[in-house]
Amino acid sequence: MLERATFAYGDLWVLRETDLHVPRGGDLLVTGHNGVGKSTFLFLCAGLLPATTGRVLLNGRAPHLTTPSDLVRNGVRRGVLFDSGGLLSNLSALNNVTLALRYHADLFGLDDQEIERRAREALTELRVTQGDFHALPAHLSLGVRKRVSLARAMVLDPNFVFFDDPDAGLDSPTRTLVYGILERFRDDPRITMVVASNSRPLIERMAVETLELSHGYLLRRNSQSPHSRNPAG
């Protein structure tokens, strides 16, 4: 996933030279103080940000140098959950979910009817009510926005998932729902998952390899499935 990778904003190092290997079907949870760069690290691993130096690879491909369609053709289907939802403000909840399917419609051989069916199915599984399907994100609560974002992340049947603070700001029923989905991903040997969170209930419930990001270094906090090394590790 990371080969001698670094990331910096000017003189501020978020990640110093690091090698990180997460095996196929493996899971990693990254903690760290607020402001340390957990979200940046997550987006770096997902290929949404380019490394300052070194390489980020998913299934042997550098995602920020590869088109989304080429990634899918080479066996990389990414699902990303942003901490605030990350939905497009001018699209309804339903259209936010259908967007990814429409982008890859030719690749997957999907027509409009199948695209809408899959999107509605994903939203319904996440307990988004039909009354919210056509609402813009600004008219949805944080909990609903996160559920819509999670539906968008799931609808392409991803084999790489990246979740930023997935349970932050959620009520208890929504949190329980999200935990169940995370556990399903964790237990699926086809899916590689990286989560950034400081949530103690989530950390305890997930029970996966946990690293702490501190001053640009990844420090091991448990060794259930060790697969990371860096100068401070």
Which residues make up each language-model segment?
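Conserved ABC ATPase "signature" region
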Residues: 113-131
